[in-house]
Amino acid sequence: MKLNKSTIEVLKNFAGINNGMVIHAGSRIRTQDNLNKQIAYADIEDSFPVEFAVYDLGEFLSALNLLDNAELDFQEKFVVVTGDGGTKLTFQYANAEFVTEAPEKVNFPTELDGGAEFDLKGEDLQRVKKASATLGLSDICVRTEAGSTAITLSATDAQGSSKHTFEINVGEADVDTEFKFFFKSERLNIVDQDYKVSIHPAGISRFLGLSLEYFIATEAL
């Protein structure tokens, strides 16, 4: 089989969450960081024929780039990758027992109880992430202010050590309520697409996209 570009994009993103990954047979993949702060699921265009694990997903993807028109043949203990010009790569699987694996599903609360919910456009997410990197800001904040229903997404420093901020209005709250939630910037390094964002005050959020779903912990200050 050949991997679609969209599948490779998701795998690269998941490698940023955890380099180790167990991939199950089928077209749904999942990963979790070692701190249990971020869990991600994706429905991909490709369907893997077997279950296998890798210690270093980034290394695996880089190895595939060594071959032109890579064709993958998944065996019991390794995958054989062939390419143009007679090139061949044999990549050994890892022991799945030593790789952090995400649960099959996350039970997200149905009631937000003072939390937040809004639609986030991919271009707005991309701009805030770029601002965070450009200005060296470690946090991303979702907030409203007293007397306003406007929801703001901003790149900032939760500890106040930087005076730089960058913010975008991303929607309106259903009611006039005040809230403020912080994320570590690196945890919002998710694939740029439109998401339905739900944040629960207990410290968990869900970013639901067309084919992607991320559960990300908010930060207690």
Swiss-Prot record:
The keyword Glycoprotein does not apply. GO terms for molecular function: DNA polymerase processivity factor activity. InterPro entries: DNA_clamp_sf (IPR046938), Sliding_clamp_C (IPR015200), Sliding_clamp_T4 (IPR046389). Keywords: DNA replication, Viral DNA replication, Viral transcription. GO terms for biological process: DNA replication; viral DNA genome replication; viral transcription. The keyword Ribosomal protein does not apply. Homotrimer. Interacts with the viral DNA polymerase; this interaction constitutes the polymerase holoenzyme. Interacts with the sliding-clamp-loader; this interaction allows the sliding-clamp-loader to open the sliding clamp. Interacts with the viral DNA ligase. Part of the replicase complex that includes the DNA polymerase, the polymerase clamp, the clamp loader complex, the single-stranded DNA binding protein, the primase, the helicase and the helicase assembly factor. Interacts with the viral RNA polymerase (RNAP). Belongs to the Tevenvirinae sliding clamp family. Sliding clamp that encircles the genomic DNA and links the DNA polymerase to the template to control the processivity of DNA synthesis. Responsible for tethering the catalytic subunit of DNA polymerase to DNA during high-speed replication. Interaction with the sliding-clamp-loader opens the sliding clamp so that it can be loaded around the DNA template. During transcription, encircles the DNA and tethers host RNA polymerase (RNAP) to it. This is Sliding clamp.
